[in-house]
Regions:
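Terminal amphipathic alpha-helical/low-complexity segments used for targeting or macromolecular assembly
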Residues: 68-69, 73-75, 79-123
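Structural signal for interior beta-strand "rungs" in well-ordered beta-sheet cores
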Residues: 1-85
């Protein structure tokens, strides 16, 4: 998708590489940097920003589960916000939310990109 940023490992030197496995859909304006690992068939919705310190919160169960640095296989991820207290008050900080698992309807929504690739069409 357009305007995607995928980081490398030039800065800082000790950083791990970004890993994006097979059949991942990366939506428009996503940024993935600082050694984040996106596992196979995950879907990153538009404007998701993932860094090594970004909280990725799975909200599909009864209680939220927080992880960092890794998007589990077949997860559907959207941008979100989380309240955080600071000395100057409470503010919203960015996070990513796992809202479900990839399914057939998700594949239909992302299939245009596959069709363009298969037919060697540049956009």
């Amino acid at each position: 998708s357009g305007g995607v940023g995928i980081g490398g490992v030039l800065e800082p030197l000790q950083a791990a590489p970004v890993i994006i496995e097979d059949n991942v859909f990366v939506g428009s304006r996503c940024i993935v940097v600082e050694g984040v690992h996106v596992e196979k068939e995950a879907v990153l919705g538009a404007n998701v920003v993932l860094t090594a310190s970004t909280k990725i919160i799975d909200v599909t169960g009864e209680t939220p589960v927080e992880i960092k640095g890794r998007v589990p296989s077949r997860s559907v991820v959207i941008p979100g916000n989380k309240k955080k207290k600071f000395p100057a008050g409470e503010y919203q900080v960015p996070c990513a939310l796992i809202i479900g698992q990839r399914k057939e309807s998700t594949d239909k929504k992302t299939s245009l990109n596959d069709a363009l690739r298969e037919n060697n069409v540049s956009v």
